[in-house]
């Protein structure tokens, strides 16, 4: 029984450039550190917008007359 490839030495050597692990972690997926500040800014602006909407809704609810039974 023969192996599916004949020259194991040639098959185990990588021909592509070495992957810089740190660079990959900074630029992809959960390790996207470069955009972290942007995400924090977006979260803060979303929170501010939601708070403003909640205040307007509360003010509107208070201005409505009380229901009379």
UniProtKB/Swiss-Prot annotation:
Q: Where are stretches of biased composition, namely Basic and acidic residues? A: 7-32, 46-69
Region feature Disordered, mapped onto this chain: 1-32, 44-69
Q: What's this protein's name?
A: Uncharacterized protein PB16A4.07
Q: Which organism is it from?
A: Schizosaccharomyces pombe (strain 972 / ATCC 24843) (Fission yeast)
């Amino acid at each position: 029984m023969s192996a599916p490839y004949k020259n194991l030495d040639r098959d185990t050597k990588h021909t592509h450039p070495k992957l810089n692990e740190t660079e990959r972690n900074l630029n992809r997926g959960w390790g996207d550190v470069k955009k972290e500040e942007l995400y924090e800014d977006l979260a803060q602006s979303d929170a501010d917008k939601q708070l403003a909407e909640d205040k307007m809704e509360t003010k509107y609810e208070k201005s409505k007359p009380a229901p009379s039974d």
